[in-house]
């Protein structure tokens, strides 16, 4: 079984915020698969589907972002998921332009509290992850107020595009492997100004 976890905060007030783009990505995957993510299980909302030949559990932890690891640990244990091979975590990245994604097979949390909670709970950095860029158009307007505020109307088209891109990338990871997905999507989304050293870490 593959476990796809989107990170975010529960509650309607956070529903369409940059910090919840992981939840939105899981919802988009579910929509494309024709399923709902509405079963409460292991401190998360979950839904089952198939992608290719794989059984997939979609999950949105309800523990709030900073305690996401509690739910992910429970899901991994209860479904006997290999956390290093069969878990994919999707979350927001304030340092990436809105509309871009980055896929990594492993690494630190880079300061993201939700990802750090998962690393702590699983006791490994060997966790596949996909970061979705949510940076504001004006860098001076970033920070907590921005990521916990609603997306602006001018951003919605790009949000829609990146959610479709995330769903495509998940399909590639599951069906063709993470190396193929990294090669295809990281290069496709690479900003011209990004230096080569940084690109090799992704």
Model regions and ranges:
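Nucleotide and nucleotide-moiety/phosphate-recognizing core
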Residues: 2-106, 115-130, 137-142, 149, ...
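Conserved TIR/SEFIR loop-to-helix hotspot centered on a Trp-containing motif
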Residues: 109
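Glycine-rich phosphate-binding loop at the start of an alpha helix
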Residues: 112
């Amino acid at each position: 079984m593959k476990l796809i976890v989107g990170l975010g905060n529960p509650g309607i007030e956070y529903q369409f915020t940059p910090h919840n783009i992981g939840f939105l990505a899981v919802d988009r995957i579910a929509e494309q698969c024709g399923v709902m993510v509405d079963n409460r299980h292991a401190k998360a909302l979950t839904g089952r589907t198939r992608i290719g030949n794989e059984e997939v559990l979609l999950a949105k932890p309800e523990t709030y972002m900073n305690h996401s690891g509690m739910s992910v640990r429970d899901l991994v244990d209860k479904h006997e998921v290999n956390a290093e091979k069969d878990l994919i975590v999707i979350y927001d990245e304030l340092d990436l332009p809105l509309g871009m994604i980055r896929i990594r097979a492993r690494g630190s949390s880079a300061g993201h509290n939700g990802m750090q909670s998962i690393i702590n709970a699983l006791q490994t950095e060997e966790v596949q992850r996909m970061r979705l860029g949510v940076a504001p158009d004006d860098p001076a307007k970033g920070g907590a107020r921005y990521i916990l505020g609603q997306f602006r109307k001018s951003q919605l088209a790009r949000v829609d595009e990146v959610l479709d891109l995330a769903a495509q990338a998940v399909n590639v990871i599951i069906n063709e492997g993470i190396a193929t997905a990294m090669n295809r999507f990281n290069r496709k989304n690479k900003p011209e100004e990004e230096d080569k050293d940084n690109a090799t870490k992704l």
